[in-house]
């Protein structure tokens, strides 16, 4: 991030009559990235698109996509937050993602990082995920499925 980028985006959205609904922003490997969900009257869409394109520089890229959905779209099933910790290894995210997809579990948000274990300094994989479970899938079933991936994988429910 550079000081003022978020402020410029917020001001541009507000000036076009938009409402900043949700966002996820993070700095990763020296780059700042963000996803935004904005509600906006249809008649202001081209105005906002032009204003956002005008913000672009060699170091600031903006991509806009209309979702065609409303914020109040119904989602079935329950939401659950989980923290997953395991020994890090190549492919661990793919293993988890494959398992979730095969169980028809939707990943709403996912944050991952690795850090050294306190005593051994071995790399440990950490994930915090918010998942939308199908109506027929219980939290207990989710936990059992995840823990079957490997003996070292631990799952904790988040509040």
Feature roles, as predicted:
Residues 1-159:
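A conserved regulatory-domain signal marking ACT and ACT-like small-molecule sensing domains
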